[in-house]
Amino acid sequence: MSCTPVSTKCNDIWIDFSCTGPSVSELQKKEPNAWAAILRSQKNQQTAEDDTIIGSICDKQGLCSKDEYAYSQYCACVNSGTLWAECAFAPCNGNKNAYKTTEQRNILTNKQCPSGLTICQNIAEYGGTGNISDLYQNFNCNSVINTFLINVMNHPFLTLILIILILVIIYRLMSSSAAKQNGDKLPPPSLIFSNLNNF
């Protein structure tokens, strides 16, 4: 079964890798070097050469840069875009056929995974319109918790709104603490800004 790529953007975090991709027997016939690399990965014997053979979308080379394999089970570690995929992304760390790079192997063997990571099994949604990308990502973590990650930094208007909201919150916190200390209230922001216009 072929996995049709929805996106070929480097480090997209939308995919759940539920598509198994070409069967193991197909992979053995079509890509014997890649299958040998996966077998070495299963035994923690992968090499830098194996990393190159498997590749990734970001590398633009190797097995995992090809459309039919990019979102298959074999590429769930190298193409997931998930931080610490080898530690906390079930399609990667829970799948023996998912190739782990030498760097990922070293993190696992040296027990360098951060503590308290939430295991995310599926990524259910990915979206964005216009020039806003990665606007929402719905992670189904531990089959219970939905975590929404919002990236507004790709859109200047949304970034400006976020900065204004932060400044308003800071002003309110400062004015309430100053009022408690002095026993009187600071003037409202509108009065302050109107006085600034008089200068």
Curated annotation (Swiss-Prot):
The source's superkingdom equals Viruses
Where it mainly occurs, coarsely classed, is virion
Per the record, membrane topology reads: Single-pass membrane protein
- Entry-listed glycosylation sites: N131
* Subunit relationships: Interacts with host PYCR2; this interaction results in autophagy activation.
Role description:
Essential for viral fusion with host endosomal membrane and core release. Not required for virus morphogenesis and egress. Induces complete autophagy through the interaction with and down-regulation of host PYCR2.
Protein name (record): Inner membrane protein E199L
Q: What is the phylogenetic placement of the source species in the record?
A: Viruses, Varidnaviria, Bamfordvirae, Nucleocytoviricota, Pokkesviricetes
